[in-house]
């Protein structure tokens, strides 16, 4: 019957064959007339039948086509699910932009569904998936992701025992930390902790990781190290799998834990420990499918560059910055591509400082780094920005622009005070001592930096302040150098240890 109808349409020059089983209207106007002549109820019925036939066809379903037929049949829930399946396929191919487009269509279809719990759960799942991809493409400070998270919170119940709310709240953590909203992130982690009972108890190590990471940003390095070690020693592979199924954030929690352990070990001047943790993190990223594996590796590289720069390993830092930029450009991670370029510029500036470049040579580095720092501030992506404030201050000091350097340090310290992000305060204070010719003021800042680093359990920062005090006061400051060196192991390979020990000979 169908063959006879099609044959008649072909002979009537309404349709033309493409191959043995495919046909198309000879002209677009004929298609439009055919559609307009059909009553709406018949059109919906036909689209519905076509969608069902496409779903039942063997092989890989054409989910975008199926979704469009469901949409025209006004079967909105099925349309949303089909667009979601299309997004999943695009994501597996690494097409983040395409996946985001399909998820946006899916959310629109879910919004057309009748109100009720089923519709809310569908919309939450789709928005969490879209927020995940938005963070991967735009960075964890993505405003688009934040809007989806906020909508999910509005749709969820107020009971953290609800899995949808639990997933949403947990997935907000990197958004708050990237914006240095440490107090809100802490409240989130502690509210979740109260719900880690029964089947969720295995998530406690990741909660410890969250507390340790926040403590690191606050400059509470001893407590941070303790929490991170507990997390690493108690986390199981089964827990990691269960957790990743509930989290809608592009960073893998386990790789992040190892990365932050590397940061904790760098504060201790433990370069052997740093290398071991970075290696663990990289191996973990290699086990994870796209996009989370590649995105998490980008995070590892970002932190590695910071550590290598601090250790004076500028060649490796430059290589890692190139790798980070390449990761971002290859996979559509625009934020990581930008960070990679900024960090490459940072390493270039540090290399110029190491070469004792003249003030004129430093000016392009100052301009470039200032532009990046101000861009991060404008986007409120400020979790590490005081580190870059300090590098800018070093460049300004080296070029003889002391008032500008002092102002940059003031900006950094003011942000630290406002956010409680004190991880680099000791360095900001130490550098401020180099912006004045007043010996008393210099000594006061250096002593404050030394004491703060001591309280924070930060041997590398304490040692820098101590050696600057020794340069200022000579032998009377040997006790400060000796006290700082006590924080390092006997065989420490941190590059500033050997010169400091020579001061005591």
What is each model feature region?
Residues 6, 47, 51, 70, ...:
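Inward-facing hydrophobic residues that define packing positions of alpha-helical scaffold repeats
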